[in-house]
Structure formats: C-alpha cells, structure tokens
Amino acid sequence: MGFLSSLGVDPRNAVFSSDTSEEQGRQFGKGRGTVDCCYPVKCMSGHYGELVFGQKQKLDILLSPMIYNLPSFLSGHVAKTLTCPRVMAAPENIKAGFIKEQDAFAEAGIKYVSPFVSLDEPLLVPKQLFNGMREALPGLTYEETAKAADAGFKALRDFSDRLRKKSREVLEWCAREDRACLMVIARPYHMDPGIGHEIEVDLQAYGYPILWMQYFPIDADLMDWAFGEDVRAGHIKSAFDIRDVWPSSYSSNTNEILWGAKVAARIPWIACVVRMSSYECGMDQPTYTPVQQIVERSGTLFFSFQDLDSTKPSGSVKIRVETITHYLEKYAATILNRKKAAMPPGCPLLPKA
C-alpha cells in the first residue's frame, strides 16, 4: 500500500482478492482458466473473477503487474533475482480468459493495468510504472510516480524488517529455552492458505515455533557467526553467497530456497525443515536433491510436501504432520545437542553471560 497511498489512494478504497480457495475458483474463475500446469498461476483466474464480478462496490482499476525480478536480501551476491517466467507472464495469460469472447473488464467499467516492472532495479521502476499507469490515472506525473515508488520500497523494507525482527525473537527464545523450532522452505505463495494448505499451522498446533525462510533474520552478528568461518576460509565471498551449492543463481526464489537450506543447517535450534512445492513446479524440481542433502548432512530432519495442488488431502496431511511431530519428539533433543556441539563459539542468539 505504500506506493498507492503515496499516490493519494485511500487504503479503504484498495480492494484485495481473498485467500485462494476452491470455492473462489468455481464461482469466479470457471470457464476462464488457461492451459497451464502451474497451479498457483491457474488460481489467478478465481482472483481476477472475484475482483471483477464479486465486489459490492464498483472498481475503477484492476492492477496486476508483470514482475520481472524481485528485490532480495541476496541481491548483489547472486547472478540475478529473476521471477519464474510463468509467474511473470501470468497477468497477460490470465487476462486472455477474460477477453477471449467479450471484454469482461470493459463491461464492468474496469481499466486493466499490468505494468512490466523490474523491482530489483529500483532506478527503472518509476519509469516502468509511469508508462504503465499514466493512461489509467490521468494527470499522473513522473515525479509523483518516482516519489510513490520510493514510498513503496520503504514500506516493503519496513514490513520485511518487522518480520525478521520477530523471527530473531523466536530464535532467541528457542536458544534461551533450548527448544526446537521448524523452518518452512517454500515459495511466497505457499503462505496463501489455499496454496500451502496451512500445513505449517497444523505443525504449530503441536507447540513448535515456525520460521519462514523468506523472513529469516539477517543481522550482521548472526550472519558472521553462522558463515564467518567459510568466508574467511575463502569458500564463499559473503554470508549470502550460494555459489558453493548453486552456481546457476538466476532465480530469486530458487536462490533464497538454497540459502534457506544452508542457514537451517547451521542454526542448532532448527531441528526440522519442511519443504513445500506445488504440482509440477519446473523451477523447484532441480532443487529437491541439493536442498535435502544440505539439510540432512547437518543432521537436521527433512520432510517435503511436493505436488501440492487445489485439493488438501486432509487424511494424508494429518498422517504426515503426526509423523513429523513423532520424529521431533523422539530426536529433537539429540539433534539440538549434536548441532550445538558443532557450532562456532559466541552464538549471538544465546543470552550474554
């Protein structure tokens, strides 16, 4: 909302589609889907339909940017931070289902706006957004767009910083109480209850704190403690360098998935990693083996939920969750002791003497 608020849009007038659900797809996306094996992309039909057909108040603009690359804490340490090509092209792909027979946007009096943006190249973003939005927002100036883009980036940084701070508090609590926690390694859309099926919620109900890899704390003291020896030995150039395990570091989320495996292996109180992946995700498939090997070689438990799609198989998920918690109850203390014995001295997560 930082970008839109800076342009003068009242937050009360900004409407977001609801969480993904089968009902949403049936009610609003039926007959408008496109041929794509990527389940998260197919879900967008329901979201578009909900915004076009399911609102009590009339919408003026449907904003769905095509994002080429993403800002990442790994930027500058990896080759590129590109988005998945399917996700980048999804707005135009899904749009086709709403204009193939008649223009549903025009009939609803909605302007469809889909600017192409390179979010990891902030100097390009104002021009990209200005060119993509000036027809929909008469009177918009480049200067206003640049100021709004800065506000948007600041809002994103503030949001990430708040969540990373909370994650650090969780880790410090685990270190202080000598308790195990779990890390979820997945793509951002798996936080959507209709795509990730709230598997992490089921696990948390057993009393285990959950950390998401995207918001792991990256404070300098923690990074130097976890990766400093490898940096000084010349194995990697920085705490965020993944070339030792993933030389082809072009995809933003893939890069962060590999880095998440590395950091989970190094933090003693992360006793288990849970990997999530959607059905036939071509970007994830090459990472299955390296991620599992990195995690398991540290003695950390590893479980994966692959090929997630529209259906939550409640029975099998329940069995998997019970299996994970059984192994944690049985082995977590041993895992923590083994990882603590191997950790460098001076862990900043522990209370100072």
Per-region residue spans from a language model:
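An N-terminal assembly and electron-transfer interface module characteristic of large anaerobic redox
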Residues: 1-353
